[in-house]
From Swiss-Prot:
Organism encoding this protein: Lacticaseibacillus paracasei (strain ATCC 334 / BCRC 17002 / CCUG 31169 / CIP 107868 / KCTC 3260 / NRRL B-441) (Lactobacillus paracasei)
Pfam families: Ribosom_S12_S23
Name of the protein in its database record: Small ribosomal subunit protein uS12
Entry-annotated residues carrying 3-methylthioaspartic acid: 102
Record GO biological process: translation
Cellular component GO terms held in the UniProt record: small ribosomal subunit
Family: Belongs to the universal ribosomal protein uS12 family.
């Protein structure tokens, strides 16, 4: 417990929180060639690499991911959710925040059904998260 004198001299330090998805906090000023403070909920980018990686122990799978160069020129690794995808190099994608716990370094998700990313085919439940249209009634 600090004394009153210590509090007068130094004061309380406010806790600063670190962003979970830092690349979404910046824009790019092409005239000045510098990053600007321009936070956004999603950002557009171009896939520079599409592949699979294996998760940390104790899980085992081949998780699909894409390396994406964002519109602010920051390059990030993003997870491709759902079963099957149509992404390849130079596909234009929309990313949102949200990490994948068992993939180190993956802090972003690709939004299915937006831009060049197709929705998941044959998805009946939780469709909005995977960009799947409502199936036609017979």
């Amino acid at each position: 417990m600090p004394t009153i004198n210590q509090l007068v001299r130094q004061g309380r330090k406010s806790i600063s929180t670190k962003s979970d998805s830092p690349a979404l906090n910046f824009g790019y000023n092409s005239k000045k060639k510098s990053l600007t403070n321009n936070p956004a909920p999603q950002k557009r980018g171009v896939a520079t690499r599409v592949g699979t990686m294996t998760p940390k122990k104790p899980n085992s799978a081949l998780r699909k991911y894409a390396r994406v160069r964002l519109s602010n020129l920051i390059e990030v690794t993003a997870y491709i959710p759902g079963i099957g995808h149509n992404l390849q190099e130079h596909s234009v994608v929309l990313i949102r925040g949200g990490r994948v716990k068992d993939l180190p370094g993956v802090r972003y998700h690709i939004v299915r059904g937006a831009l060049d990313t197709a929705g998941v085919d044959g998805r009946m439940q939780g469709r909005s998260k995977y960009g799947a249209k409502r199936p036609k009634k017979k």
